[in-house]
Amino acid sequence: MQLYAIETGHFKLDGGAMFGVVPKALWERTNPADQYNRIDMAARSLLIEDGNRLILIDTGLGNKQSDKFFSHYALWGGYDLTSSLTKVGFHPDDITDVVFTHLHFDHCGGAILKNKNGIYEPAFKNARFWSHKDHWQWAVEPNVREKASFLPENIQPIQESGQLNLLDSSATPLGFDVLLMDGHTEKQMLPVIEYKGKTIVFTADLIPTVGHLPIPYVMGYDTRPLLTLAEKSAFLKTAVEKDYLLFLEHDAHNELISLKNTEKGVRLDKTFTLDSYFH
């Protein structure tokens, strides 16, 4: 097995939305804001090469939206999904499986392209798409709070592709299991990957950045914030006890981290890249 960090594109989001009720004076210590109160964000996917399978976890925002849409997110950094795949020696047609931790647009947008005729089509024509069945139902019949994150131009083409597979438990046929979390959205899936003697958890939107390690630091986007608090507390307790490494999807400056116990709770120990840790 070989793992690759795939940068699909950096963007910015409102810091207040990303930290909910936590005062800016606290969260900006780890996540400094620009003049518009926006913080740096990554959309970092994980590519798993395992035998004859090439599995991509999440796909970023994609590039099919309008300039007006992207103007709200201040894209920066010059990364894109296809170029990042090429950099590690692969083509979108090589991907055998795409796992969506959940279907918010910044996690699944890169799975669908708009072709030269204006038609939406899969970016990974040879891949199977994987979502949790309860989350899929949540996305196709969205609540008012999340509706703006479940874009029809993402969801409908995935549904019509004939490539969609739905999971109904934490076990998967992909060589790894997932943790199911319901605080951010219904049945968010966090892949748990055994790699070179270590356990790596793709933390998606449970812990989007290092700044979200303190238990009360919960996103304003979460549908069930009290549940997020409980899920994060239990997860971090296990993670530090079992010496997990966390792969951060949204932290533009920290890719892979280890944890330690402190008098204030579980906090950052060290930060790495996949390459620096395993090579």
Predicted region positions:
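Extreme N-terminal starter segment of soluble prokaryotic enzymes
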Residues: 1-2
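Active-site metal-binding loops of divalent metal-dependent hydrolases
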Residues: 8-9, 59-62, 103, 134-135, ...
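Conserved beta-strand hairpin/beta-sheet module of binuclear metal-dependent hydrolase folds
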Residues: 9-87, 190-205
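Cap/insert and terminal regions of metallo-dependent hydrolase folds
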Residues: 72-83, 196-199, 203-279
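Metallo-beta-lactamase
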Residues: 76-90, 94-106, 121-180, 185, ...
